C-alpha cells in the first residue's frame, strides 16, 4: 500500500532537527561501511543542496541530523538522501522493501533559545541508547569531530555552529561546547529536552 502524502512546510534559513527511523524499528546500519556511505551521501548532497550541517548521530536503527537551510527544499534534500541510501542498503544486503519508517520527521528549532541544546541532545543519543558512557567515545557522531577525535573535513560546518555562542575565540567555544554536553550527561533535559516540548513536529 502506498504511503499517504503528508504536509510539509519548507522554510529558508530555518534550523531543523531531523530524525529518520528504520522501518518497524529495524536496523538501517549493519556494518561500518553503511555508516560511511550515508555520510558520503550527505557530503555529496551538500554540493547540490547547499546547507549548513552542524550535528549528526547515527544509531543502529535511526539517525539524527541538525541542519540549517539556505534557500533550498529540505524535503527534496531528504528525499534524495533517503532514496540513495535505501537503494544502496537494499542492494548491499540483498533485500527489498522499505528501509525507513515513513519519510522523515523534523522540528523547526528556535535558534536563539535552543541552538546548542538540540546539538547536545543529538550528541547524547548514543549515551541514552546505552552504546557508550561518554559521547566522545561514539565514533558515528559529530561530537567526535568537535572533540577532534576524528577529522570532519568539509562535512560539518563546525565554526559556524560554534559561533552561535557569541564569542570570537572559536577554540574556547569548542571547549565550552564539550563542557556543556558532558555537563548534561545526568540531566533530565538530555532525556526529554525543552526544545522537543516547545517546537512543532512537521
Tell me what each language-model feature is.
Residues 1-55, 59, 68-202:
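Short Pro-Cys-Gly-centered "Cys-loop" motif that presents a nucleophilic cysteine in a tight turn
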